[in-house]
Structures are given as C-alpha cells and as structure tokens.
Amino acid sequence: MLAAIFGLSGPVLTADERAFFRDADPAGYILFGRNVVDRAHLRALTDDLRALHGRDRLFICIDQEGGRVARMKPPVWAAYPPQGQFDRLYDLAPASAIEAARANAEALGLDLAEVGITVDCLPLLDVRQPGADDVIGDRALGGEPLRVAALGRAVLDGLARAGVTGVVKHVPGHGRAGADSHKALPTVTASAAELATDLAPFRSLSQAKIAMTAHVRYTAWDDTAPATLSARVIADVVRGAIGFDGLLLSDDLDMAALTGSIAERAARAQAAGCDLALNCWARMDDMVGIAAALAPMGAATAARIDRALADTDIAPARADARRSDLTARRDALLALLP
C-alpha cells in the first residue's frame, strides 16, 4: 500500500486513473465537489474504489465541515451551519452547544456514511486568535482551549456514532496564523509558552484516530520548515508534547505554503514523520511522481490506518429517520441564539 491519499479528476475514474490506482494501491482518496453528482452516483463511485482495491474499509475522505466548506451541497444534501455557530451557542449555554455540535456531526456523518465515505476532515481544533487570517475564522470552534476541546470531542463523538472517523486539524494549531497557507507560508513567532494555548485542545483529544498537519512555521520550535515538513515539530510537539499516536495526514501538498516539486514535498513530509501524504488535485504526473518518491509504508502506519477505519460503517441503519431527528434537535438548540 502506498502512503498517499489522492484526489480524483472527475465524477468517474478515467481509464488512466483506474490503471494507476490499481498498480500504485494508495492508502485512500479525497473527494471534492468535482467528484459529486448525487447520492446514487457518489455511492457507486466509492463502491468502485473499494472494489478496485478489494478493501471493504477504505480510507475515503472529504472536507465536509458545514458553512463555507462543503463539497456535498444543496439541493441534493442539506446545508449545515458553520462550526462557529456552536461557539456562539456555548457563550449562552455550554451543555446545549455540546449537544447541538454532537447532533449536527452525527447527522452530517450519516450523509457521508450512506454514500460510502469513511473519513471527514473535521473538527478544527485551531484556537482562533485575534488578528489571524480569516482562512480559519468561523470554521473554528472558538478562541478558548477548553471550549474548543469540549466541542471538538462532541464532533468526533457525533461522527463516530454515524460510522465515520473524524480528523482533528490543523496540528499543532493554525489559529494564530497571519496568512492563508493555501496562498503563502504563515510564520508564527509566538513563544513556546504562548503556543501552549494552541496545543491544549490537541492534547485533550490526543486519542483521536487521525490528525492533519498545519503548513505553518513556528519559530519557537523550528524556524527552518513548516510543521508538515519538520521532523522536530512532529517528533517533539505532535508525538511528544501533544502525545498523539494516531494516523498523521499531511495537509494538501499542493498548497503555496510549501516549495519544491510535489514529489519532493511528499518525500519530505514522509521523512519528517507524516504517515500519509495528501495530494488533492489529481494531476497524473504529480501522482506518479509521489508514488516514485515515497518510501514503502511501514508497519506502524499500516496499523494506524487499520485502527482509524476499524469502526467505520458504510451501511448506517435508519439513516433518514435518525438524520431528521438529529437536525431537529440541533435546530431547536441553535434557536436559542439571538
């Protein structure tokens, strides 16, 4: 198995993709709006991917957060609120906010499970800081670590109840970055003591099964490389101070925060300690280069993948009725907001 997650170019596999994926055997896939038509189509696509690899439990992920980050959209799928709504509700009624976040995540997870998606890149555990770039903004669960951890745990629990594994991101924290890492490399100059705030939610949820790295440079830890490419940050901070021993996924290697060829980025991420290299844009030359650049997957990474997918369920019972009940409960709680 190749230690990579690849994107697909369109709503069905091309002949070239099918041949390449069969031979390369990537650990999994990430889906975007370009891959999505409707429920029947999306289930057929994910079933095709499972059949191609002969793996019933296949890592198939998506960024389905709610708000401005949603790949599955109305009118086929329901709209979900941005995660920041639960932060706002927490100001008024913390227990209600936690319940609403859990119900929302379970309903959203049912949408994913019934079309064969096993992993959602949610929740964000980034602690939002004043003056940061708005790339996180209302996607965040708040600006206070205990709150972010409590709501993040509720999101993970809700997704798990639906048979979907959540991904905590962007470790070790994107909440104070002054630039959008899609466009440039953010450099955070906060001290190690100040960064304890950023680490706190990740430490609280260090037993999460999957985490995604931040393409952010933290001068207090390593002023030479962003976290994704820093062996020091991954060993000392992610695996060390945070205590995370789950599956570590890079953020998209095609983002402008990183330099070098895509293959070089993948090799550097793996050498730094990322279990899986994420490449979203389905450019065949890049994917072939990544396959050639990556070292064979180690036993520890393979075991982490197995643990991450062990409780996934792509045949949720009573999905429609459960989703209706869950969204009604969420909406009743969010109605408390002024």
What is the meaning of each model-derived region?
Residues N35-L52, L58, A70, R153-A154, ...:
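Second-shell residues forming the walls of enzyme active-site clefts
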Residues G28-R34, T118-L124, C274-A277:
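Divalent metal-dependent hydrolysis catalytic cores, especially in the metallo-beta-lactamase
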Residues M1-A24, G260-P338:
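Preference for extracellular/luminal or secreted protein segments
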Residues M1-A3, E65-D91, L125-G137, G166-T187, ...:
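N-terminal small/glycine-rich loop or linker at the start of catalytic domains
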Residues H53-P81, A101-R128, V148, L156-P172:
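Glycine-rich, aromatic-flanked loop segments that form ligand/cofactor-binding clefts
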Residues H41-A51, A107-L108, I117, D320:
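Charge-biased, low-complexity intrinsically disordered regions
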Residues M1-I60, G66-V76, P338:
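N-terminal hydrophobic targeting/anchoring segments and the immediately downstream early-domain regions
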Residues R34-N35, A78-I98, A132-L151, A179-A196, ...:
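Glycine-rich tight-turn/loop motif centered on a GG-T
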